[in-house]
Each structure stands twice: as structure tokens, then as C-alpha cells.
A protein has these predicted regions:
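A C-terminal junction/extension of Radical SAM enzymes
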Residues: 94-167
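Radical SAM/AdoMet-radical enzyme domain recognition
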Residues: 1-92
Length: 167
């Protein structure tokens, strides 16, 4: 969708007029090497979003030894475009299928790993302590129990499955 917005601004306007006010945009790095799929198109896509009043969430897939050294740069790029980029949703890569341990360890990165790298790459401007876990499924089941007066199952996820902060 970002490449389409970059190449065809009219399509971006049509999407906005159809009611879409936010675009989740793949953005894996600040260099052509780490973000080959849409590095050159990103500025044009942001310009289209700026003109149409569409906000953007960058969604980088983070892969250890590939782009984990650019997390601070991604945040800085988002800050430079704060008028249109309202969030960055870092997604550690999901490795599935048959893969040897050494290869898995080469690329695997966790949310806590990302948070640590962000602190290092922002020179402590965004610290590990600035983050909080975002799992919010359990309160929903508690509300359902309160309204139904019947015990329900609890939906929960591991605390390290997500983290958020505001900067």
C-alpha cells in the first residue's frame, strides 16, 4: 500500500476518501540495504499521506544482524516526520519451519532485545524503563465475567510479547 501511495497519489486520495485515515507501512530500516523493498518510495508515500491527511504507523520487521542496528534511526526518521507518522510498531521476526539452532540464533530477536537496542541507539533518550507491557486481553475477560456473573476463561499472553512507550 505504501508503494501504491508513492507511485499513484490519486489512489492515496481515493483510499482516504473511502474512509481510511491510517496506513500501516512496512519500514524495515533507514537505508536501502536494510529496507530494499520500499526505501526510495517512503518519502513519496509520506508526502501523499501528508497531502491527504492520512496518518502512518511504521511497522519494521526486526531481524537480528540484518536491521537491528537501525532501530534508533527508525525512531529518529519517524520523529522527523511526526506530522504524519504517529507510531512505530517494531515486530521481531517470526522464525518458523525447519531451521538449525545456529541459524535461528543468528536472526532471532525478542521484544526485550529490541528495547535494549533502542536505549543504546538513542543514547539513553528512550530507556528500557520507559517501556511497559501491552497485553490487555485479561481485563476484557474480567469485564465479561462482571457483566455475566459467570466465570470465564482468562485470555493472557506473556509479558514480553509486546511493549509500548510514548516519546
Amino acid at each position: 500500500n505504501g508503494i501504491r501511495h508513492a507511485m499513484d497519489p490519486e489512489a492515496g486520495r481515493e483510499v482516504r476518501m473511502a474512509g481510511c485515515n491510517n496506513l500501516y507501512l512496512s519500514f524495515d530500516g533507514v537505508t536501502a540495504r536494510t529496507n530494499p523493498k520500499n526505501h526510495w518510495e517512503i518519502p513519496h508515500a509520506l508526502d501523499t499521506c501528508r497531502k491527504t491527511g492520512t496518518t502512518v504507523v511504521f511497522v519494521p520487521t526486526v531481524i537480528k544482524s540484518i536491521n537491528d542496528h537501525e532501530l534508533g534511526g527508525i525512531i529518529r526518521y519517524a520523529q522527523k516526520n511526526l506530522d504524519v507518522v504517529h507510531a512505530v510498531n517494531f515486530q521481531p521476526v517470526s522464525l518458523t519451519g525447519r531451521m538449525g539452532k545456529s541459524e535461528r540464533e543468528k536472526y532471532r530477536i525478542t521484544v526485550p532485545d529490541c528495547v535494549q537496542r533502542i536505549e543504546e541507539q538513542t543514547d539513553g533518550q528512550v530507556t528500557v524503563d520507559d517501556w511497559f507491557p501491552v497485553p490487555s486481553c485479561m481485563p476484557l475477560t474480567n469485564v465479561i465475567e462482571a457483566f455475566s456473573s459467570k466465570p470465564k476463561y482468562e485470555l493472557s499472553i506473556h509479558f514480553a510479547c509486546g511493549a509500548g512507550t510514548y516519546i
